[in-house]
Amino acid sequence: MANISSIHILFLVFITSGIAVMATDFTLRNNCPTTVWAGTLAGQGPKLGDGGFELTPGASRQLTAPAGWSGRFWARTGCNFDASGNGRCVTGDCGGLRCNGGGVPPVTLAEFTLVGDGGKDFYDVSLVDGYNVKLGIRPSGGSGDCKYAGCVSDLNAACPDMLKVMDQNNVVACKSACERFNTDQYCCRGANDKPETCPPTDYSRIFKNACPDAYSYAYDDETSTFTCTGANYEITFCP
């Protein structure tokens, strides 16, 4: 065990070198009237919550991520798993109860990069992969802009017919134009791989008008990326 002097020296090293070791708590809450299954995927850092778990109506679960973590969260709907966690979901499927990758589009995403440039957290709600449920991100205890980010409109109700995903005569998700048409124009690739050559489309404007604070397409950064320093975050499905 380290003695008091060595602990004091270690503390001074962290302070004088400007290193802040902080963990961030995420609280995932289900306000939907039906059960959802949260999915998690890390781009950098450890897998959180074993990759996925069930949230009954009104339930919540807290996950803790280290500084430097990046990744995404989403809700899966219409899932059916056996005792071993094998099965599938109608929306947001990721290979089992504990996700083996990202959710199959269309799916609403909460995206984070913790302690990025300037020590800030970067976060957003993205509809780039389409939409399945309402979603909100609320920071707490941080400093800086720390604004609420979310898509709180029912895009399934406003989804154009050609983008609808149906299950048993119900609209369960709304595809992005990129997912539906798979062209450079809608996917911002090839000759359209820059903001100057990939402007908003009629389809992305439908998403943006419904959810002004969410990413509606790949280059929708200006009004859709939010920052906060030293915060914890509540991610609510169906806020």
From Swiss-Prot:
Pfam families: Thaumatin (PF00314). Residues 1-23 form the signal peptide. It is found in: Secreted, Extracellular space, Apoplast. GO terms for molecular function: mRNA binding. Keywords: Apoplast, Disulfide bond, Pathogenesis-related protein, Plant defense, Secreted, Signal. GO terms for cellular component: apoplast; mitochondrion; plant-type vacuole; secretory vesicle. It comes from the Eukaryota. SUPFAM superfamilies: Osmotin, thaumatin-like protein. InterPro entries: Osmotin/thaumatin-like_sf, Thaumatin, Thaumatin_CS. Induction: By 2,6-dichloroisonicotinic acid (INA) and salicylic acid (possibly an endogenous signal for acquired resistance). Strongly induced by pathogen infection. Partially responsible for acquired pathogen resistance. Belongs to the thaumatin family. This is Pathogenesis-related protein 5. It comes from Arabidopsis thaliana. The lineage of its organism: Eukaryota, Viridiplantae, Streptophyta, Embryophyta, Tracheophyta.
